[in-house]
């Protein structure tokens, strides 16, 4: 299966972001990808990061999902879209999964917020396993996979062969960009992604924005913990790669024995 990871720049408006999504979906489909994943809260943008976020309400959310569902259907590509989900309790950071026929498969809200995000968002309270072309996958959003390994293991122990990891690290004005993938002198983010893959024997597809000063790459990490492919830091575009699902056995995830650790 070929997967596509989309690294667009931060959208300057909702319409600009939608055009980026449309173009990248079409390009990924033309290159044979079965699924495409966008960064964390791409529409309308992630609050609290120093960037202006366009106004966004439930009507805007409905407009976005209708448009993206139509493009998924016309391009025949499943899509994981990082969005802001408007609920009665407040705004959530979420990822919406849309099938290649345009039907919504489900939504994964970010359950473990970074402490700095709590003034802007409310957490989700459920987790979901998804499928594309019969392949089970999970979603862990940014801080969840970086700091809470349980969010990835939850999916891996339930059969996920890959966990998609939409995130944002660094920015256009501040950030420490690694010299190379896994750079020991750089922030811990890429090393954490490597651990999530290795400790569960699954693929991790980690998706960042195209930023001037990113602190982690858009990359695919194999079940053995090696970087299969990555985009150059700060480069806008698509990372497309075929993954070997036979390698994603989930062996180490299924060997976890919680009964050996009594409360």
Ranges and model annotations:
Residues 16-25, 147-153:
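Short, acidic/polar
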Residues 87-186, 191, 247-262:
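Active-site catalytic loop in hydrolytic enzyme cores
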Residues 60-80, 146-236:
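CN hydrolase (nitrilase-like) catalytic-core segments centered on the catalytic cysteine
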Residues 14, 22-101, 169-198:
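Cys-nucleophile CN-hydrolase/nitrilase-fold catalytic domain and related Cys-dependent amidase chemistry
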Residues 81-83, 94-97, 128, 218-220, ...:
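Short beta-strand scaffold segments in enzyme catalytic cores
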């Amino acid at each position: 299966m070929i997967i596509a990871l989309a690294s667009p720049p931060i959208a300057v408006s909702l319409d600009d972001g939608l055009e980026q999504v449309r173009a990248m979906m079409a390009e990924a489909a033309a290159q044979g990808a079965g699924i495409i994943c966008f960064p964390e809260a791409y529409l309308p943008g992630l609050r609290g990061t120093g960037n202006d976020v366009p106004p966004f309400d439930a009507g805007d959310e409905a407009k976005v999902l209708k448009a993206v569902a139509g493009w998924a259907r016309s391009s025949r590509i499943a899509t994981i879209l990082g969005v802001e989900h408007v609920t009665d309790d407040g705004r959530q950071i979420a990822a919406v999964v849309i099938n290649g026929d345009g039907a919504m498969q489900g939504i994964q809200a970010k359950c473990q917020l970074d402490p700095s995000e709590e003034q802007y968002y409310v957490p989700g309270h459920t987790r979901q396993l998804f499928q594309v072309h019969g392949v089970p996958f999970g979603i862990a959003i940014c801080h969840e996979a970086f700091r809470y390994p349980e969010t990835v293991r939850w999916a891996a122990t339930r059969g996920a062969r890959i966990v998609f990891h939409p995130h944002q690290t660094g920015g256009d004005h501040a950030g420490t960009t690694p010299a190379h993938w896994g750079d020991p002198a750089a922030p811990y983010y890429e090393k954490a992604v490597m651990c999530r893959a290795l400790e569960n024997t699954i693929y991790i597809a980690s998706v960042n924005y195209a930023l001037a000063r990113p602190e982690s790459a858009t990359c695919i990490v194999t079940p053995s913990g090696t970087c299969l492919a990555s985009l150059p830091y700060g480069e806008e575009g698509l990372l497309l790669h075929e993954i070997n699902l036979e390698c994603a056995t989930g062996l180490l995830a299924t060997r976890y024995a919680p009964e050996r650790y009594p409360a």
